[in-house]
């Protein structure tokens, strides 16, 4: 029942799947040089360094990888980002298709709907086969202090060739098990901790690192809840800190060299100052939801206060996000600027692209919330079938005049995050998001169009409270 309804209700919201025949036409010219191709003599050879990638299980669109190595008694840290724009000519039909799709879509328990055709993805992804492959990358390179593990001296941005092989591609689980054995992982954790501590001086947003929610996984018997181990959480936080470091540097680089780009912003400094210093990650997440704090895409420079950076962009996921591709073209323009290249985007074009990225991202957030809701209802149904009852925890976040907005935060002993809303007229009771209520549930109905009656006992508990 749930899988059939998912195919009918949720999956279509992710849009049109890729068409192999059409993709063959789109990728006819991907091996041809174009205006923003980087010649081999301008690429730095980093194929001699071990390069590692850590991604979710089943990932084949690895945007990022890293190397940690010692040279001349100095410790270096390199973040390598895939370079798909090497194969994409601006204003081509391939580029138009990427702009139209804007992001890769990830329907649950289904294959992704990639933003890029498979040929470009395979050429760009920083994963290799068992023999290894040379891939093109844009690398952020910095020296690291051997004692504090903080980045020191000048940070460089390089166009590179890197060597990637399957043996160095890990899942978060695999990496968490081997982190003490692989020196690059061990040092990487220390570098990420130093980056986090530096950010903590500028934002309470680092408290979000504490938040860990269970999520559905799937096997032949259906959907089940899984909670990351401590080691998996540490590995995810490490990769996230690497991305924040790179995105912040590129944001600053674009500001200094162009004062234009597509920036990820969140104006929340004043609001963050109102929060007490001892706030937990879960409390902060609850406050963010209740107060409607969210990030924007903008073509002008503003700070991202939740991550604690005065300049911030999305640069590290170009295989799956249009915004990152745009940053890559701008970086290449800066590289070629001395050759009197024309700028790839006008101010008005950047503004339109930023608006598109924002609208598509927000629309997809709604689809993801629906997807999560649907799958968590499926999990609840399975748990009730096996055990007759479950316990859920919930709190009310607000009332719009027609809809009462609720967050389900616990299913049995698992922390979850599931939005739920009820159509209610003239709701006049006090709303306190800190008041979490727990109820026993014996019935869950498959989601159709509205949340109402999917968890009947929850509806009854809220309306009679």
Model regions and ranges:
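Electropositive polyanion-binding surfaces
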Residues: 2-6, 27-464
């Amino acid at each position: 029942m749930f899988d059939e309804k998912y195919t009918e209700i949720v999956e279509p919201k992710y849009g049109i799947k890729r068409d192999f025949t059409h993709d063959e036409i789109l990728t006819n010219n991907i091996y041809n040089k174009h205006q923003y191709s980087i010649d081999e003599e301008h690429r730095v050879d980093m194929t001699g360094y071990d390069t590692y990638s850590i991604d979710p299980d089943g990932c084949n669109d690895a945007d990022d990888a890293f190397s940690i190595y010692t040279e001349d008694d100095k410790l270096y840290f390199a973040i390598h980002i895939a370079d798909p724009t090497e194969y994409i000519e601006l204003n081509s039909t391939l580029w138009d298709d990427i702009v139209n799709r804007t992001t890769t879509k990830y329907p649950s328990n289904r294959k992704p709907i990639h933003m890029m055709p498979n040929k470009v993805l395979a050429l760009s992804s920083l994963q290799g086969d068992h023999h290894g492959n040379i891939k093109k990358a844009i690398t952020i390179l910095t020296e690291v202090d051997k004692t504090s593990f903080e980045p020191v001296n000048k940070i460089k941005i390089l166009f590179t060739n890197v060597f990637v092989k399957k043996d160095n591609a890990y899942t978060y689980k695999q990496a968490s098990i081997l982190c003490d054995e692989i020196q690059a992982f061990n040092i990487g954790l220390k570098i990420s901790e130093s980056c986090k501590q530096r950010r903590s001086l500028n934002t309470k947003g680092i408290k979000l690192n504490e938040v860990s929610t269970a999520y559905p996984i799937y096997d032949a018997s259906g959907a089940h809840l899984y909670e990351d181990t401590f080691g998996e959480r540490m590995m995810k936080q490490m990769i996230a800190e690497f991305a924040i470091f790179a995105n912040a540097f590129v944001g600053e680089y674009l500001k200094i060299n162009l004062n234009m780009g597509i920036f990820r912003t969140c104006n929340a400094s004043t609001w963050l100052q109102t929060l007490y210093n001892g706030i937990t990650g879960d409390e902060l997440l609850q406050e963010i939801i209740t107060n409607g704090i969210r990030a924007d895409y903008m073509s002008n420079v503003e700070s991202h206060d939740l991550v604690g950076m005065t300049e911030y962009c999305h640069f590290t996921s170009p295989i799956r996000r249009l915004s990152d591709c745009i940053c890559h073209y701008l970086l290449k323009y800066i590289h070629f600027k001395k050759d009197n290249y024309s700028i790839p985007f006008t101010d008005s074009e950047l503004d339109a692209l930023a608006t598109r990225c924002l609208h598509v991202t927000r629309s997809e957030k709604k689809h993801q919330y629906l997807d999560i809701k649907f799958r968590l209802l499926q999990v609840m149904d399975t748990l009730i079938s096996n055990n007759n009852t479950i316990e859920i925890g919930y709190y009310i976040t607000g009332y719009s005049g027609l809809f009462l907005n609720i967050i389900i935060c616990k299913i049995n002993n698992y922390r979850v995050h599931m939005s739920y809303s009820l159509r209610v007229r003239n709701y006049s009771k006090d709303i306190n998001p800190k008041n979490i209520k727990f109820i026993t549930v014996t019935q869950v109905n498959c989601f159709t169009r509205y949340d109402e009656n999917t968890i009947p006992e929850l509806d009854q508990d809220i309306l009679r409270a």
